[in-house]
């Protein structure tokens, strides 16, 4: 069993974000990748990654959310009703959640989500910590640690030499971002 992952995202403007996320999940060895996206993205996604299962009905998404498989929420989402409807389905469920930081900014409160991994770039990290972007650039390691402590999650601070920290141990990816 190589595990399962449910990816939720891909708004009108950013279907490429979910395509990239799903491709990387497959390439990293996830055995079964489910994807919930807007209807207009389904054909684009299946042309690029025919081996994943694309959900096109909210009731099927709700059923999968009850299975407690890990969820990557937010790649390619924007602040709108669709995004908030998904959050309403996810909240107060015991999900293991990987959150795109832009999604966190949209839903405003993550109290009802069990976040395990947070994926911000420097601009998103600055907004989540309520500091200028320049302070994140100046001290990426401490910024990532602060995010991990604030959200009690592993933080993957994307960028040149991506940082991964749980708030105690920090690793730097020297092979690109």
PLM feature spans:
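Small-residue (G/A/S/T)-rich helix-start motifs and N-terminal tracts that mark the onset
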Residues: 1-96, 105-114, 126-177
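Short, conserved phosphate/pyrophosphate- and ester-handling motifs at nucleotide-, phospho-/glycolipid
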Residues: 121
